[in-house]
């Protein structure tokens, strides 16, 4: 049985800091794209600039894994907190599978949903699946990567079908390998991964697409706002590709 962490001063301070940087439930969908946009453009500026030395590209390549996983972790942690703030029944089901600490239900400056988020490592597929199990009825990532998100807007057009697994049948392996590389980069300054452009292109696409597809289905479930695409008087949920994230011809409007 998974244990709920004790409310130490350090943990409370950390959760309050995370709360202060977290946007509202109506904004966090676009927050992921904006976070991705800033770092994706930086990485690609190294790739496109012929004046950059190879060692600078290698450094940027290593750090890109840290960024990809950071965006992923932030998104799924924030969604977890939002969902468990909105749905008390969902929280009660999760609590039934966990072992509370002595101070779990004591009054404090942090919400129960925030405390529960610290019981899971969102950089680990098994942990993420367990955190979202009650929301989706099990196999959360496998389900959203196999489920059709169409019709939706992609690359300025309406796609009748959009299934992550059909685009990347090895998404699970790519995610796990990216987690592994990120862990080595963060904890071993001597580690130098081989620069594999084909792999990193797959990884950045998957780490951009899966949170957006998750957004699509979670927004449907909780009737939340999402980014939409207008075509012939109809509105469709929109999914950004890497090429669109890198372009300068789009803005988010209300």
Specify the residue positions occupied by each region the protein language model found.
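Short amphipathic alpha-helical segments and their helix-coil junctions
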Residues: 38-56
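Polyanionic, low-complexity intrinsically disordered segments
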Residues: 6-43, 157-162, 166-254
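Helix-loop junctions and short alpha-helical segments
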Residues: 50-60, 64-176
């Amino acid at each position: 049985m998974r244990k709920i962490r004790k409310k130490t001063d350090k943990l409370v301070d950390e959760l309050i800091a995370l709360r202060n940087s977290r946007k509202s439930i109506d904004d966090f969908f676009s927050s992921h794209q904006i976070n991705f946009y800033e770092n994706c453009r930086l990485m690609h500026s190294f790739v496109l600039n012929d004046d950059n030395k190879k060692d600078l590209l290698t450094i940027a390549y290593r750090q890109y894994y840290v960024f990809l996983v950071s965006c992923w972790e932030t998104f799924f942690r924030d969604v977890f907190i939002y969902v468990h703030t909105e749905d008390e029944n969902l929280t009660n089901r999760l609590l039934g599978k966990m072992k509370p600490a002595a101070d779990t239900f004591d009054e404090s400056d942090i919400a129960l949903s925030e405390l529960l988020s610290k019981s899971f490592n969102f950089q680990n597929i098994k942990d993420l699946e367990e955190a979202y199990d009650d929301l989706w009825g099990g196999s959360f990532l496998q389900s959203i990567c196999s489920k059709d998100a169409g019709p939706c807007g992609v690359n300025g057009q309406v796609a009748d079908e959009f299934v992550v697994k059909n685009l990347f049948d090895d998404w699970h392996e790519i995610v796990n390998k990216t987690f592994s590389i990120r862990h080595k980069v963060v904890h071993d300054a001597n580690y130098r991964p081989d620069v594999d452009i084909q792999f990193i292109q797959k990884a950045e696409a998957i780490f951009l697409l899966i949170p957006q597809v998750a957004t699509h289905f979670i927004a449907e479930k909780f009737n939340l706002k999402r980014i939409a695409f207008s075509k012939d008087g109809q509105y469709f949920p929109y999914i950004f590709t890497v090429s669109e994230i890198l372009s300068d011809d789009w803005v988010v409007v209300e």
